[in-house]
Amino acid sequence: METSNGTETWYKSLHAVLKALNTTLHSHLLCRPGPGPGSGTGPDNQTEDHRASLPGRNDNSYMYILFVMFLFAVTVGSLILGYTRSRKVDKRSDPYHVYIKNRVSMI
């Protein structure tokens, strides 16, 4: 008896995205030579027909660009946030606040 734990749908959707990305990346047409200079001036009909039947090569390229930009923004944002949080000037555990600040008034 098989039980579904919720990762199966995630796996299927990830597989579909990777399959679509793979077909997008590998759907380019190879350059085929034409019929030759002596056999006519028309274009290679096989290449033209094949190109017309395939979907556009860059149909989903904007999604890839947005994905890369999003990852870059998250990386830079986390670096900036981590740096600013680590550089807090007025920390209560600072030795100045613990030992020196209260004793200066006694002198």
UniProtKB/Swiss-Prot annotation:
Residues 72-83 are annotated as: Interaction with KCNQ1. It comes from the Eukaryota. Belongs to the potassium channel KCNE family. Residues 82-103 are cytoplasmic. It is found in: Cell membrane; Cytoplasm; Perikaryon; Cell projection, Dendrite. The lineage of its organism: Eukaryota, Metazoa, Chordata, Craniata, Vertebrata. GO terms for cellular component: basolateral part of cell; cytoplasm; dendrite; membrane raft; neuronal cell body membrane; perikaryon; plasma membrane; vesicle. The gene is Kcne3. It comes from Rattus norvegicus (Rat). PANTHER family: POTASSIUM VOLTAGE-GATED CHANNEL SUBFAMILY E MEMBER 1, 3, POTASSIUM VOLTAGE-GATED CHANNEL SUBFAMILY E MEMBER 3. InterPro entries: K_chnl_KCNE, K_chnl_volt-dep_bsu_KCNE3. Ancillary protein that functions as a regulatory subunit of the voltage-gated potassium (Kv) channel complex composed of pore-forming and potassium-conducting alpha subunits and of regulatory beta subunits. KCNE3 beta subunit modulates the gating kinetics and enhances stability of the channel complex. Alters the gating of the delayed rectifier Kv channel containing KCNB1 alpha subunit. Associates with KCNC4/Kv3.4 alpha subunit to form the subthreshold Kv channel in skeletal muscle and to establish the resting membrane potential (RMP) in muscle cells. The chain crosses the membrane at residues 61-81. One of its GO terms (molecular function) is voltage-gated potassium channel activity. This is Potassium voltage-gated channel subfamily E member 3. Interacts with KCNB1. Interacts with KCNC2. Associates with KCNC4/Kv3.4. Interacts with KCNQ1; associates with a KCNQ1:KCNE3 stoichiometry of 4:4; produces a current with nearly instantaneous activation with a linear current-voltage relationship and alters membrane raft localization; affects KCNQ1 structure and gating properties. The keyword Cell cycle does not apply. Its main location: membrane. Glycans are attached at N5, N22, N45. Pfam families: ISK_Channel (PF02060). Residues 31-54 are annotated as: Disordered. Keywords: Cell membrane, Cell projection, Cytoplasm, Glycoprotein, Ion transport, Membrane, Potassium, Potassium transport, Transmembrane, Transmembrane helix, Transport. GO terms for biological process: intracellular chloride ion homeostasis; membrane repolarization during action potential; membrane repolarization during ventricular cardiac muscle cell action potential; negative regulation of delayed rectifier potassium channel activity; negative regulation of membrane repolarization during ventricular cardiac muscle cell action potential; negative regulation of potassium ion export across plasma membrane; potassium ion export across plasma membrane; potassium ion transmembrane transport. It is a single-pass type I membrane protein.
